[in-house]
Amino acid sequence: MLLEAGGEDYNPLIHIPAGYIKTMVNPAMNWMFETEPEEGTGNRRIAIPRGKVLGGSSAINAMLYVRGQSADYDDWAQRGNRGWSYDDVLPYFRKAEHCEPLANGDDDFDDNLHGVGGPLNVAEVRTRYEALDRLIEAAETIGYPHNKDYNGATQDGF
């Protein structure tokens, strides 16, 4: 038995990556949770999108696959949660993935960090937009690194 609140995921906003932004403000698909005001955020409330649809939050994730920061896993292990260091969970990430590098080799996928043959297809965006390229160039100009694989060795950068 599967128990989930919300309706089925027939809404096209769920199945089109650009529709992601609309799911963030739609109470029919999002529980609309927010943090309490925090001093470190200028006393703002920060949205915590949680899916109110069959599939839960996975249905409103913009079709992105982003692993947690390795330091977070290592912190869990250091706090006594054996088996939860990044090195411990990495084999499971690899087993779950079917990573598709770009045909032209213009990516930074490290075979030691990614898997092939798993049920979760992970691929670089195939369609490039000039505006995105300009954003990345601007970020590099002011010192941010360009990161072609944010599930790789580091998640820092654009």
Q: Where on the chain are the PLM-derived regions?
A:
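N-terminal redox-cofactor-binding region of secreted/periplasmic oxidoreductases
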Residues: M1-F158
